Amino acid sequence: MNKAYYIGLMSGTSMDGVDAVLVDFAGEQPQLIATHTEAIPSHLLKGLQRLCLPGNDEINRLGRLDRSVGKLFALAVNNLLAKAQIAKEDIIAIGSHGQTVRHMPNLEVGFTLQIGDPNTIATETGIDVIADFRRKDIALGGQGAPLVPAFHQQTFAQVGKKRVILNIGGIANITYLTGNREEVLGFDTGPGNTLIDAWIQQVKNEPYDKDGEWAASGNTDQQLLAQLLSHPYFSLAYPKSTGRELFNQAWLEQQLSEFNQLDEEDIQSTLLDLTCHSIARDILKLAPVGELFVCGGGAFNTELMQRLAALLPDYHIDTTSALGVDPKWAEGIAFAWLAMRHNLGLPANLPAVTGASREAVLGGRFSAK
């Protein structure tokens, strides 16, 4: 059988590395051939975190970081291909998500901005790059996010089976597959790992709470949890999407100002419950019973998975491994899939999910020639 190799590149709101995946789309189901994570150097990470906050001299910083992130993404591709021992000539295209530095779709003139110059990726890898997937959807009146539900529908939908696919990155999003292949819902539920990562980084200088152990050692403060859950985002009707613009360290500090007496591990436990409760509430609104399959970094947080199970007693819960897709690489595979859709001239957004006025071919092509 002929191969249909595409590469997917993803760096999410967690900014915990660039995931690069090599996927073969020749068969009915995507086949994961090789994977690689490229660490984000600390100087680049600091620059990106600064750019995500309001500040001065942003245009110079944006321009420099756009190129630097492009070079980092290209390095991820070249290392992936070296590891897989596959020639660049065998790759049809790279699908690059880029690094989101602003996502503000609800302004009068909404916009989203991802950096990681695709021209740089194309020239440094010698492979055509398909990128800028979100802005066409926004131009059509949509949120530009989440985009993964279209991939979830194609890969995980089964006639007659109600399934929820939960992707927990920095932000969490859900896809509700109703059992009718044509019908799908999806939206961002709110914070995934972003606040629990930010708090442990601030207090313990650790990148993330492994297995949720620190959160498990604390006790949730119900008053703080109720205050956090009163954020207006949680009561918005979908389609909706969010990011660091709403849920960030500055917002967290503001929320904690009246809770100085709390132990640090109790705050961590409360933040984990914010993630779990906001996800569970939205899932229960869609269907009281069903199957839940989890992917993204959150799938590996044992405490998070246990708390979700307790909040969703009538759900059968597993990771997407049970459906044949490695939960760690699911989002990277989705962006390889988006590149494949663009290459074939096929639409890749779901208006019922994003609120766009119509389906559209997403992204632009940046030639390596």
Curated annotation (Swiss-Prot):
Q: Which GO terms describe its molecular function?
A: ATP binding; kinase activity; phosphotransferase activity, alcohol group as acceptor
Task: Fetch the Gene3D superfamilies from UniProt.
Answer: 3.30.420.40
GO biological-process terms attached to the record:
1,6-anhydro-N-acetyl-beta-muramic acid catabolic process; amino sugar metabolic process; peptidoglycan turnover
Keyword Kinase on entry: yes
Its pathway? Amino-sugar metabolism; 1,6-anhydro-N-acetylmuramate degradation; Cell wall biogenesis; peptidoglycan recycling
Reactions catalysed, as given in the entry: 1,6-anhydro-N-acetyl-beta-muramate + ATP + H2O = N-acetyl-D-muramate 6-phosphate + ADP + H(+)
Main EC class of this protein? transferase
What EC number(s) does its UniProt record assign? Answer: 2.7.1.170
Show the InterPro entries listed in the entry: Anhydro_N_Ac-Mur_kinase, ATPase_NBD
Record keywords: Ubl conjugation included? no
Domain of life of the native organism: Bacteria
Keywords noted in UniProt: ATP-binding, Carbohydrate metabolism, Kinase, Nucleotide-binding, Transferase
What is the annotated signal peptide range for this record? none
Q: Which residues are listed for ATP binding in this entry?
A: G12, T13, S14, M15, D16, G17, V18, D19
Q: Which family does it belong to?
A: Belongs to the anhydro-N-acetylmuramic acid kinase family.
Its job: Catalyzes the specific phosphorylation of 1,6-anhydro-N-acetylmuramic acid (anhMurNAc) with the simultaneous cleavage of the 1,6-anhydro ring, generating MurNAc-6-P. Is required for the utilization of anhMurNAc either imported from the medium or derived from its own cell wall murein, and thus plays a role in cell wall recycling.
Q: What is this protein called?
A: Anhydro-N-acetylmuramic acid kinase
Q: What is the lineage of its organism?
A: Bacteria, Pseudomonadati, Pseudomonadota, Gammaproteobacteria, Alteromonadales
Q: Which gene encodes it?
A: anmK
